[in-house]
Amino acid sequence: IQQYRNSAESGKKKAISAEFCCVCEKNIVPLQRKFKGNILMLIGRKNESQVLLEALNADEAQFVAVYGRRRVGKTFLIRETLRDHFVFQHSGVANSPKHIQLQAWQESLTEAGLPVEPLRNWMDAFAALKRLVKNSRKKKKVIFLDELPWMDTQASYFLPALEHFWNSWASARNDLMLVVCGSATSWIIRKVIQNHGGLHNRVTTKIHLRPFTLLECEEYTQYKHLNFTRKQITEAYMIMGGVPYYWSCLQASLSMAQNIDSLFFSPEGKLCDEYSALYASLYKQPANYIRVIEALATKQTGLTR
């Protein structure tokens, strides 16, 4: 907050977040998107975008893991930075068994230009992916697997198939970049980044995508033409944090209080069910965690043993 206050007191133009906006005494002129060569700049995501581009330009195969809480903008960052290099992109299906996951994978292969017969297992799925990559004429080939934890269903042997794909073939190619992503942060860390099996030390780049800072939230409101005062922006930050999706739901025609009421407390509000959805995205059995939070909420000073 002190950094936020200091930006208002300065009478000089200065760079904030290294090229994302110019801050003046009374005005912020944000540049939410601009191109520098072929580099797409995003509010609050320059460092992460640059890390992805450095991995893209590496001389050897890259295994990139991007993780962070729900709605923080992981998929948006990856697509906006790397979309021109995708040869295959796929997203897991929430709360669905193995055969549904494989059917969705088959559909993604078809959309990418490789019609295949129904897949029996994950080994077949990754074998088909190999054929797709081999057929691509792109100089750099990016495979983007979104919501990876959802694919790892019970007794599906998804992880062993992924390990085999990377260790036996993908890691030997200098034109390949595998990007995996998921909102279940604990799963990504435990099963991929800190894996003690076939994926041990295989991740070459990891990105923990965090919410916007308070200053970045102001930049976003200026870009969206939301004429809120700094007091209102600070209040919204105390309520919603810096989660980009939540800020994208704000409407310029409503006051901040009206926005919050409409989003969170209206039965039809976009974020009315976010509480339960957030826990469901983080944990396979969210009910226990929700009960803990609800128990703590009954006491003003919390609970002790």
Question: What are these model-derived regions, one by one?
Answer:
Residues 1-305:
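Phosphate-binding site recognition
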